[in-house]
Amino acid sequence: MGNHSGKRELSAEKASKDGEIHRGEAGKKRSVGKLSQTASEDSDVFGEADAIQNNGTSAEDTAVTDSKHTADPKNNWQGAHPADPGNRPHLIRLFSRDAPGREDNTFKDRPSESDELQTIQEDPTAASGGLDVMASQKRPSQRSKYLATASTMDHARHGFLPRHRDTGILDSIGRFFSGDRGAPKRGSGKDSHTRTTHYGSLPQKSQHGRTQDENPVVHFFKNIVTPRTPPPSQGKGGRDSRSGSPMARR
């Protein structure tokens, strides 16, 4: 009897333990179910469900709502429409000066693009006036050229020295450099007459009998290069070549 009662107590304890174990497992399952339910609720807002739901194409009947989630027809979105080529001109024509719809007057005073290609007709009166001006400009230059050539010729003719009419100074210079120092001084009759006829004013006769139009200075330089014949020696009685000296007769 005692053994049977002991066995019953052991079986009752086992049964109570088993019931507690089953209760604990059921409680764990319930807690796990609650956690999964809360996770699913979170995923509806932040998880995969929300991403999958919003990644699709938007519905056509969506409308913009205010804070009270009431649809307002004024807030309806207008779909984007492509540019209408009929109402909007091309950009090149829009920025061209001949564009039909320009409202500013930036290029108002400028000629159009087609007018720029036209030829400009010249005015015949203006052209003739320009030719006259060119001719008048050429005339002074030609006159200056003529004067320059004349001045150079004059300088070359007269040994690059100005023309002097004072023959007394030139005669003295010529006598000094020509070696005619042995001639008597002025105031002695025939010799002075001979000297004045030789160094007198133009025209003079050269050694060959030709009339020369040269300046006395040029004649002086020529005498230095080609010295003239010495003056004729005076004969007895003071007669020269013009008075019929025997030296002239020989």
From Swiss-Prot:
Gene Ontology cellular component list: cell periphery; cell projection; compact myelin; cytoplasm; internode region of axon; myelin sheath; neuronal cell body; nucleus
Modified residues (Citrulline): R157, R163, R239, R250
Phosphothreonine: residues carrying this PTM: T149, T152, T167, T197, T211, T226, T229
Region spans: Disordered: 1-150, 175-250
Residue list for modification Phosphotyrosine: Y146, Y199
GO biological process: maintenance of blood-brain barrier; MAPK cascade; membrane organization; myelination; negative regulation of heterotypic cell-cell adhesion; positive regulation of chemokine (C-X-C motif) ligand 2 production; positive regulation of interleukin-6 production; response to toxic substance
Composition-biased stretches (Basic and acidic residues): 1-28, 95-113
Keyword Cell wall biogenesis/degradation belongs to the record: no
InterPro entries linked to this entry: Myelin_BP (IPR000548)
Annotated disulfide bonds: none
Modified residues (Omega-N-methylarginine): R175, R181
Skewed-composition ranges (Polar residues): 197-206
Tissue: In the embryo, isoform 1-isoform 3 are found in neurons within the central nervous system (primarily in pioneer neurons important in the formation of the cortex) and the peripheral nervous system. They are also expressed in the thymus, gut, lung and kidney. In the adult, isoform 1-isoform 3 are highly expressed in the brain (mainly in brain regions rich in oligodendrocytes) and spleen. Lower levels are seen in the heart, kidney and lung. Isoform 2 is also found in cells of the immune system.
Residues with Deamidated glutamine modification: Q234
Modified residues (Phosphoserine): S31, S40, S141, S144, S151, S172, S188, S206, S241, S245
Site (Cleavage): F221, K222
Keyword annotations: Acetylation, Autoimmune encephalomyelitis, Cell membrane, Citrullination, Cytoplasm, Membrane, Methylation, Nucleus, Phosphoprotein
GO molecular function (one): calmodulin binding
Modification after translation, per record: As in other animals, several charge isomers may be produced as a result of optional post-translational modifications, such as phosphorylation of serine or threonine residues, deamidation of glutamine or asparagine residues, citrullination and methylation of arginine residues. Methylated on arginine residues; decreases with the age of the animal, making MBP more cationic.
Subunit structure: Homodimer.
Family: Belongs to the myelin basic protein family.
Free-text function comment from the UniProt entry: The classic group of MBP isoforms (isoform 4-isoform 13) are with PLP the most abundant protein components of the myelin membrane in the CNS. They have a role in both its formation and stabilization. The non-classic group of MBP isoforms (isoform 1-isoform 3/Golli-MBPs) may preferentially have a role in the early developing brain long before myelination, maybe as components of transcriptional complexes, and may also be involved in signaling pathways in T-cells and neural cells.
Protein name per its UniProtKB record: Myelin basic protein
Protein source organism: Mus musculus
